[in-house]
Amino acid sequence: MHNLTLFLPCPAGVEDFLLAEVQAICPAAAASAQRQRGGVELTGTWDDVLRLNLHSRLAQRVLVRLALQPCPHEDALYQAAHQVLWELWFTPAQTFKVELTAHQCPFQSLNFAALRIKDAVCDRMRERFGQRPSVDTVQPQVRLHAHLGPDQVWLYIDTSGEPLFKRGWRSDTGDAPLKETLAAAMIAASGWTGLDAQGQPQPLYDPCCGSGTVAIEAAQRALQIA
């Protein structure tokens, strides 16, 4: 099966916990998993993509890398994005959105950089199909991600859709809700697994539970609910 370069972003400080989780979910790809700044990168298959989207409690998304190119200036960014075979991944009938992050990027405007990527995608689609896709910044059907470094750009397509912290059980956000992925990171940092050293059930106490996110996340983990 074709190997893919995957990147799972997470909050700073969670990388080591996410690495251990990824290696447990995808043992066949465990050797390739590497801790990166702000996430974990690995080489995997579409089966791994499905498993990670279903079972990861710490990742924010599961991204497939489509390009890694030199990018010293905005024109190089356009060329890098224009060379990607976007037509293999979606059609002009689908809406899309470009999300961009950066670290030590020399560009003056990240908004302009995102527009250059958008223009490159639309231009390539128009060249291939005679029409261009529309941008939807609220509920896009396809999410593209770019990360800009000092002199390189990483281009990804998102396989998750909605962020993975949206587990599907929360009907009301309440005041200042804790993201489920952050609650999972707190549980991972505590070392709680649901069982003690003798294999007996181990309670978890959250005296400041608020809307109960930590407790619910712990219960789902203990019951192995995806």
Name these PLM-found stretches.
Residues 178-226:
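Conserved S-adenosyl-L-methionine
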Residues 45, 101, 149, 156-162:
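Generic beta-structure capping elements
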Residues 48, 104, 152, 161, ...:
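Short loop/turn segments at secondary-structure transitions that flank enzyme active sites
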Residues 2-142, 200:
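Non-catalytic nucleic-acid substrate-recognition regions in nucleic-acid-modifying enzymes
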Residues 155-193:
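SAM-dependent Rossmann-like transferase core, predominantly class I methyltransferases
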Residues 143, 152-154, 201-204:
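Beta-sheet entry/capping signal
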Residues 2, 149-151, 212:
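Short flexible coil/turn linkers enriched for glycine and charged/polar residues
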